[in-house]
């Protein structure tokens, strides 16, 4: 059996305000992997909900919706105030906020049926084992989400440096190479970040501040993925987890480290990883994890040819017994 996940990202409704993809036939839920809409200079969005209202279950969207914020939602705004505003917007619209949050499919859907759910005779053993206070059989799936951001270290000597490396175990030369690569990535990113005009604590939020946020998200994500779970794990991030997602139009340049992380060691901890940010689709398997992106991108840059509005990822799942949520 499978759970069917519709995936959309990088819709950039600030320049495509009339773009409204429809629900994918048979989808069990929708994942919005960031950069849905922003209020950067010249935005064409007329509402105050970052374009999320059109995906609201309260406004008629037929499935649960999971949302991980991107980077552009913060353009021309204060980071912390916007973070709170986005979360409140999701709560108002009935969209599940997934920034440094984990939710199971059982929590997300409750007792609702979904397209991939087996009939009772197909889960006889599970039904027989269920006690009177248990909820109906449900797929054992958890969604672990964060914007993730980037540490700008993807193009450094990552085969030597890792999250567990220490100064005593790593050569001074390797650390110097890492810093040089990071500085180049900072310069490439800051060219654009200065135009984005995101502020934090009264100052522009540039690459160094973004790295600080990325390290917080990485620590959270690593801990969350390492939490024992008897089921299928889906990671959802805006920034890519691996250089394997790099946009082939640009190759491996310092700017690539502003889009991709080198967190390949985390891939075995998930069965599916959904992301956005790069305006190039991805669908590959690494270390047993399928990595998928389905971004719309910018029409003016001819980036939309690979986008599929009704794209659905079918996730094979096993079924478990869950107690009724409190």
PLM regions: where:
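Beta-strand-turn-beta hairpins that frame and shape the catalytic cleft
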Residues: 1-6, 103-118, 134-144, 231-232, ...
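A basic- and aromatic-enriched beta-loop-alpha substructure that forms the phosphate/nucleotide-
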Residues: 65-110, 138-160, 168
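Active-site-proximal loop/helix segment associated with metal-binding centers of metalloenzymes
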Residues: 115-118, 127, 141-234, 241-245, ...
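Active-site neighborhood of phospho(di)ester-bond hydrolases with catalytic His/Asp-centered motifs
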Residues: 7-9, 30-35, 66-71, 96-101, ...
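Charged helix-capping and loop-helix junction motifs
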Residues: 46-53, 81-85, 251-261
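Active-site environment of divalent metal-dependent phosphoester hydrolases
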Residues: 12-18, 37-42, 72-83, 103-107, ...
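N-terminal active-site segment of His-dependent metallophosphoesterases
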Residues: 1-67, 74-81, 126, 207, ...
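Binuclear metal-dependent phosphoesterase catalytic core
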Residues: 2, 124-130, 247, 253-271, ...
């Amino acid at each position: 059996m499978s759970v069917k996940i519709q995936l959309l990202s990088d819709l950039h409704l600030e320049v495509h305000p009339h773009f409204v993809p429809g629900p994918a036939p048979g989808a069990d839920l929708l994942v919005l992997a960031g950069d849905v809409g922003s209020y950067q200079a010249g935005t064409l969005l007329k509402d105050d909900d970052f374009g999320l209202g059109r995906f609201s279950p309260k406004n008629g969207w037929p499935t649960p919706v999971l949302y991980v914020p991107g980077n552009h939602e913060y353009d021309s705004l204060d980071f912390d105030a916007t973070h709170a505003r986005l979360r409140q917007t999701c709560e108002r619209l009935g969209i599940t906020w997934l920034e440094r949050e984990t939710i199971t499919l059982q929590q997300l859907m409750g007792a609702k049926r979904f397209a991939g759910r087996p009939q009772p005779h197909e889960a006889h053993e599970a039904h027989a084992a269920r006690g009177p206070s248990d909820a109906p059989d449900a797929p054992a799936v958890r969604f672990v989400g964060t914007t993730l951001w980037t540490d700008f270290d993807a193009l450094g000597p990552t085969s030597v440096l890792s999250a567990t490396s220490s100064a005593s175990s790593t050569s001074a030369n390797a650390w110097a190479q890492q810093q040089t690569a990071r500085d180049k990535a900072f310069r490439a990113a800051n060219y654009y970040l200065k135009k984005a005009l995101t502020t934090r604590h009264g100052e522009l939020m540039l690459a160094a501040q973004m790295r600080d946020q990325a390290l917080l998200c990485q620590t959270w994500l690593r801990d969350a993925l390492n939490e024992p779970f008897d089921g299928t794990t889906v990671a959802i991030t805006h920034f890519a987890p691996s250089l394997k997602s790099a946009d082939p139009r640009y190759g491996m340049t310092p700017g690539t480290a502003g889009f991709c992380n080198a967190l390949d060691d985390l891939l075995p901890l998930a069965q599916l990883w959904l992301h956005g940010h790069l305006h190039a689709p991805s669908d590959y398997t690494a270390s047993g994890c399928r990595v998928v992106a389905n971004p719309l991108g910018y029409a003016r840059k001819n980036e939309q040819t690979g986008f599929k509005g009704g794209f659905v990822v079918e996730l094979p799942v096993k079924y478990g017994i869950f107690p009724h949520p409190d």
